[in-house]
């Protein structure tokens, strides 16, 4: 249980994990255990760990994480004064409002994972809400931009129909809290038609978790930049 207090939890493929021994679990339930119970893969599916990493790759993964999560505080730079010029895009002409809406919904527009891969020099995706599952429509993790470690949280439209489940909001909350504890700026990439409206989501507290996510984001002790990359 103590290992579950880690900021980032990594397991080797096929590793046995869990609180109670398999025999005790089976005796308590009186039912045969599902295949793969108490394995790293099962815990990953249910949002309990961040990564499954082969032993041969552990050294590189851990070294990248240490580099990203334990950067020395940057010295304060001399404040720059002046106005930021509004960027201009060559070949772009502002058209009717509906054309802009269609452009924002273009099927070939870059996704959150595309932006993350282009923005960061190194990036480690973190998985799971530590409660129920891992919503793939929310992609998040720590990366570095121009030698500055940041927490990136994006809505990935190519997964789960781009609709966010309660587990996705809880994962976002977890990453926000981790960023706050480590003093990392947060960048969010927004692109979604809305939260998943199914009954199962309601039963897992979608209304509550959306409200608490907004409350948390509005009271963070670190800077947060939100970038709208779609709808």
What are these regions (language model features)?
Residues 7, 87-90, 184:
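A generic hydrophobic-helix recognition signal that picks specific residues
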Residues 21, 34, 38, 54, ...:
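Alpha-helix initiation/capping motif
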Residues 1-74, 190-231:
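Conserved catalytic cores of soluble enzyme domains
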């Amino acid at each position: 249980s103590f290992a579950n207090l880690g900021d980032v939890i990594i397991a080797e493929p096929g590793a046995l994990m869990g609180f109670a021994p398999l025999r005790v679990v089976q005796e308590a339930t009186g039912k045969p255990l599902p295949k793969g119970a108490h394995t790293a893969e099962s815990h990953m599916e249910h949002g309990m760990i961040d990564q499954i990493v082969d032993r041969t790759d552990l050294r590189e993964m851990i070294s990248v994480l240490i580099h990203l999560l334990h950067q020395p505080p940057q010295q304060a730079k001399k404040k720059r004064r002046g106005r930021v010029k509004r960027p201009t895009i060559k070949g772009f002409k502002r058209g009717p409002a509906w054309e802009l809406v269609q452009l924002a919904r273009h099927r070939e527009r870059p996704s959150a994972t595309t932006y993350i891969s282009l923005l960061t020099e190194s990036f480690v995706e973190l998985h799971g809400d530590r409660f129920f599952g891992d919503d793939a429509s929310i992609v998040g993790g720590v990366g570095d931009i121009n030698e500055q470690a940041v927490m990136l949280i994006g809505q990935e439209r190519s997964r789960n129909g781009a609709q966010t489940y309660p587990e996705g909001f809880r994962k976002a909350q977890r990453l926000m809290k981790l960023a706050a504890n480590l003093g990392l700026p947060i960048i969010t990439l927004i692109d979604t038609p809305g939260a998943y409206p199914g009954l199962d989501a309601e039963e897992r507290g979608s209304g509550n978790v959306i409200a608490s996510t907004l409350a948390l984001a509005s009271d963070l002790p670190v800077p947060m930049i939100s970038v709208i990359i779609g709808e």
